[in-house]
Amino acid sequence: MMTSCRNIDLGTMMMACGCGRRQFPSLAKTVCKFTSSNRSYGGLVGSCKAVPTKSKEISLLNGIGQSQTVSFDLKQESKQPISLVTLFELVAVDLQTLNDNLLSIVGAENPVLISAAEQIFGAGGKRMRPGLVFLVSHATAELAGLKELTTEHRRLAEIIEMIHTASLIHDDVLDESDMRRGKETVHELFGTRVAVLAGDFMFAQASWYLANLENLEVIKLISQVIKDFASGEIKQASSLFDCDTKLDEYLLKSFYKTASLVAASTKGAAIFSRVEPDVTEQMYEFGKNLGLSFQIVDDILDFTQSTEQLGKPAGSDLAKGNLTAPVIFALEREPRLREIIESEFCEAGSLEEAIEAVTKGGGIKRAQELAREKADDAIKNLQCLPRSGFRSALEDMVLYNLERID
């Protein structure tokens, strides 16, 4: 894989294309090339060539003129593990305001609905989706010359978290989950009927606030996400224990269930910054690739982490017949795995045998490569943004996800 970038303004700070060096404070143009054998951003090896501002780009392309070259291996750099606390430091105030507003925004008059909302919001959560909205909002606002975030940026983050929360309530009902983030789920506390109504109410309330943004492009974008949620659930339900499920079908289902909301979040943030359409599209692709990478990593962890780490039994997706990337890859090399799955684990110990076959058949390794491939694509999508702390935080979000399987 080769990524090339030309004619990048350096100023006095950092270079683009993932090169955060300060070696060239008086130079203004670079050609950066990165190569990778394993397609992982963390494994990129590259070099940057910088020339004085007065040199013309054509001389760079032809290798003419005075220049100096610095080679570096990003894989060799020592870097502390990325935590969510440090990841969202730049938008901590924005996220605190969002947390303070969430319950009042739900605004339910029915005490049961209020209790349900308090249960799900009070359970905490990483607030990753609104965090992404704020990071992209700040990064693109800089590009558009905005001094601060708009009311629309902030309302979008709140709407996204409400939609995500509503989807979790419904997911817990469908999956019959009794715990969420260490707390009892809404349907476990209040019953299935109240949980379904609470999720419906939150979707409706989010839609009302969405309509009040009065931006048709964003309204269509977010409305499509709600449709995608349903499409993803139907796709999953109709393909349980189906060993002929293709990787493309898995990725489409993962887009519907996970990446669609992330992509809409990042694109919506860019739209409200009023940047050029090509930038908003790159932000959509960034969200899509990041969302897919996250889902693939989650599906890997279902096999590699313990029940205590997962908060649910290991291999629980497989046990329900939900075939994810590691299983799809392993099925190509392990005929016995097909037999076990199609029997729906009717024999004692068959689930444990299937989990072992997934690892033995190279399913975990190939799924890791796929997650890194999507991560690489996400990093490339960010190259349209000016180098800033906010862009660096978005890059770190990609790396944070990959660190979960390193």
Swiss-Prot record:
Residues that hold an all-trans-polyprenyl diphosphate according to the record: 180, 257-258, 295, 312
E.C. numbers: 2.5.1.85, 2.5.1.29
Domain of life: Eukaryota
InterPro entries the UniProt entry points to: Isoprenoid_synthase_dom_sf, Polyprenyl_synt, Polyprenyl_synt_CS
SUPFAM superfamilies: Terpenoid synthases (SSF48576)
Effect of inactivating the gene: Decreased levels of plastoquinone-9 (PQ-9) and plastochromanol-8 (PC-8) in leaves. The double mutants sps1 and sps2 exhibit an albino phenotype and are devoided of both PQ-9 and PC-8 in cotyledons.
Sites where the protein binds isopentenyl diphosphate: 126, 129, 164, 181
Transmembrane segments: none
GO biological process terms on file: isoprenoid biosynthetic process; plastoquinone biosynthetic process
MF term (GO), any: all-trans-nonaprenyl-diphosphate synthase (geranylgeranyl-diphosphate specific) activity
pH-related activity note: Optimum pH is 8.0.
Residues reported in the UniProt entry to bind Mg(2+) 2: 171, 175
Transit peptide start-stop: 1-71
Cofactor(s) the protein requires to work: Mg(2+)
Keywords attached to this entry: Chloroplast, Isoprene biosynthesis, Magnesium, Metal-binding, Plastid, Stress response, Transferase, Transit peptide
Subunit: Homodimer. Interacts with FBN5.
Family named by the database record: Belongs to the FPP/GGPP synthase family.
Miscellaneous comment in the UniProt entry for this protein: Plants over-expressing SPS1 exhibit increased resistance to photooxidative stress, decreases in leaf bleaching, lipid peroxidation and PSII photoinhibition under excess light due to their increased capacities for plastoquinone-9 (PQ-9) biosynthesis. Plants over-expressing SPS1 exhibit decreased singlet oxygen production in response to photooxidative stress due to increased levels of PQ-9, which acts as a chemical quencher of singlet oxygen.
Protein name: Solanesyl diphosphate synthase 1, chloroplastic
Provenance organism: Arabidopsis thaliana
